[in-house]
Regions:
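Short linear motifs at protein or domain termini
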Residues: 1-63, 170-185
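Alpha-helix N-cap/N′ positions at the starts of helices
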Residues: 30, 53, 75, 137-140
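Conserved amphipathic alpha-helical segments that form helical-bundle/coiled-coil interaction surfaces
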Residues: 46, 67-128, 140-148, 156-166
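Mobile beta-alpha loop/short-helix "lid" or hinge segments that flank ligand
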Residues: 21-26, 118-121, 135-136
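Short helix-capping/hinge motifs at transmembrane helix termini and TM-loop junctions
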Residues: 62-63, 108, 131-132
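C-terminal regulatory/effector modules of DNA-binding transcriptional regulators
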Residues: 4, 134-185
Length: 185
């Protein structure tokens, strides 16, 4: 891995160990490193936590956002539309995550941002796995978030981001249910 990245072993090893510590990777042995798969229960717990925390962030962002912030969010959505049209899942994933963390920046909640980063590290692989299957559902409610923030409506922004997490999360939920149903095979 270090060779592929054109760097020395130490920073790669440190990064891998950090991801193991954060629960994103598992390392049964020094030569066996894998992406950790969340259980259905873990996914549902993370989704519930995100709904509360990101709801709080969206509500505060609605109160704090400048017109420039709103335009930046709208531009991110335009770029995400282009990524969807181009079937560029990687770019879409990056823009989706950037959108959610831009809300944190607007809300000026750095401690909460750090907590959400930890949750995203754990759920990121599942989001990546389901993003292409989710298609439009992965960003549809972002438009309502932006409109609510533009209108300075914290309650609507909170509901919009929570609905986004539920709607986009349906694909993830189905993946986890399917895994659970085939575990006995």
């Amino acid at each position: 891995l270090a060779e592929k990245m054109g760097t020395s072993v130490t920073p790669v090893r440190d990064a891998v160990l950090r991801l193991v510590q954060d629960g994103a990777l598992i390392m049964p042995s020094p030569r066996d490193i894998r992406v950790r798969s969340l259980t259905l229960t873990e996914y549902l717990e993370i989704r519930s936590i995100r709904m509360e925390l990101e709801g709080m962030v969206a509500a505060k962002a609605a109160l704090m956002a400048t017109p420039e912030d709103v335009e930046k969010l709208a531009l991110m959505l335009e770029h995400n539309e282009t990524a969807l049209e181009d079937a560029d899942a990687q770019k879409g994933l990056e823009l989706n995550q950037s959108f959610h963390f831009e809300l944190c920046r607007i809300a000026q909640m750095p401690i909460l941002t750090s907590i959400l980063h930890q949750l995203w590290i754990k759920i990121g692989p599942l989001i990546a796995q389901s993003y292409t299957k989710g298609g439009r559902h992965m960003i549809d409610y972002h438009y309502l978030v932006v409109r609510s923030i533009r209108e300075k409506d914290p309650q609507a922004a909170k509901i919009a981001i929570q609905t986004d997490l539920l709607s986009g999360g349906n694909v993830m939920l189905q993946l986890k249910i399917n895994e659970t149903n085939t575990d006995w095979l």
